[in-house]
């Protein structure tokens, strides 16, 4: 009996961290490192560099700060949602001060979670990657 093995490599998932604070970049990188599925990490400090990264690479998950030097993360998620190629990428909006206005934009753009940076952890990453439908989740 002859057997065949599939030697094709499964592409490794890649997380794009869009955050201008080096300290918060490190925190998010540590959280990704503790998740069950190991991922490559790419970091963008601005929305402009995030756009370039999204054009050049396949991204599996986006961790997005709301206040960036060249724009607002909550507005950027609307841009992502309008792009058919990018709309299916799970997004977690990680902010110092989530506001009701941010929740509204996040929900309309299909963001998985809006999380305070102090509360952000592995469970959000694993749940976002495990969900098949993009949706915003928040406490009522």
Predicted regions and their residues:
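Conserved acidic carboxylate
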Residues: 19
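As written
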Residues: 73, 105-113
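C-terminal output helix
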Residues: 101, 118-129
């Amino acid at each position: 009996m002859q057997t065949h093995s599939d030697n094709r490599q499964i592409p490794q998932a890649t997380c794009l961290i869009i955050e201008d604070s080096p300290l918060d970049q490190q925190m998010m990188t540590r959280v990704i490192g503790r998740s069950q599925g190991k991922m490559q990490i790419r970091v963008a400090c601005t929305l402009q560099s995030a756009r370039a990264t999204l054009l050049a690479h396949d991204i599996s998950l986006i961790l997005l700060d709301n206040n960036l030097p060249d724009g607002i993360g909550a507005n950027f998620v609307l841009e992502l949602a309008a792009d058919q190629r990018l709309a299916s990428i799970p997004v977690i909006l990680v902010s110092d001060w989530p506001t009701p206005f941010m929740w509204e934009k996040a929900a309309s753009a299909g963001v998985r979670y809006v999380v305070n940076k102090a509360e952000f952890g592995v469970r959000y990453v694993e749940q976002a990657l495990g969900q098949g439908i993009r949706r915003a989740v928040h406490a009522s």
